[in-house]
């Protein structure tokens, strides 16, 4: 809900003068892009730092003094980094591509909510985003056991959302462009 309301407020107040439907796509690319940088980039930096500490034999400088749950958590991170392979990288890239497509799609839907002053589109964007979070929640709860299945479900949901957003994008009319002669007459 937070992201969709944030998009709504951005389109409504901060980006008022951006009225072209392409601006919705651009906003979605920026929103999804910064999220991808933060999620993948910071995770990669963390994994590289852990791998460097392990490879240099310096990990003890971090683990010394840790006890119980703290030590278990650090050891779990080390094990995760050690087992990280190409399949994990592919899965992460696929997840971000799906998320990026979703951000663009939801930006178009929210843009239409602002442009046509129809709050129902904002509600729909919130509902679609919530639905998109269900497979990951089911995985976390142990209902789904395969990250590949989660990504496949997300892909299906994302493609449906993208098809709907494309329809909404095409339905949006471009604002009338004021020509130089129109401005001179005013």
Task: Place the predicted regions along the sequence by residue.
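Hydrophobic alpha-helical segments at protein termini of multi-pass membrane proteins
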Residues: 1-186
């Amino acid at each position: 809900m937070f992201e969709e309301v944030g998009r709504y407020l951005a389109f409504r107040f901060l980006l008022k003068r951006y009225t072209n439907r392409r601006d919705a796509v651009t906003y979605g690319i920026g929103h999804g892009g910064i999220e991808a940088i933060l999620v993948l980039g910071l995770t990669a930096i963390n994994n590289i730092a852990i791998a460097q500490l392990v490879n240099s034999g310096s990990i003890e400088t971090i683990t010394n003094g840790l006890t119980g749950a703290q030590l278990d958590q650090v050891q779990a991170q080390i094990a995760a980094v050690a087992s990280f392979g190409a399949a994990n990288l592919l899965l992460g890239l696929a997840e971000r591509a799906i998320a990026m497509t979703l951000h663009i799609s939801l930006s178009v839907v929210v843009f239409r909510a602002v442009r046509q002053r129809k709050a129902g589109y904002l509600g729909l964007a919130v509902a679609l985003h919530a639905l998109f979070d269900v497979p990951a929640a089911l995985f976390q709860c142990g209902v789904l056991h395969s990250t590949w299945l989660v990504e496949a479900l997300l892909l299906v949901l994302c493609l449906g959302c993208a098809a709907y957003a494309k329809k909404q994008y095409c339905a949006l009319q471009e604002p009338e462009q004021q020509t130089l002669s129109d401005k001179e007459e005013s």
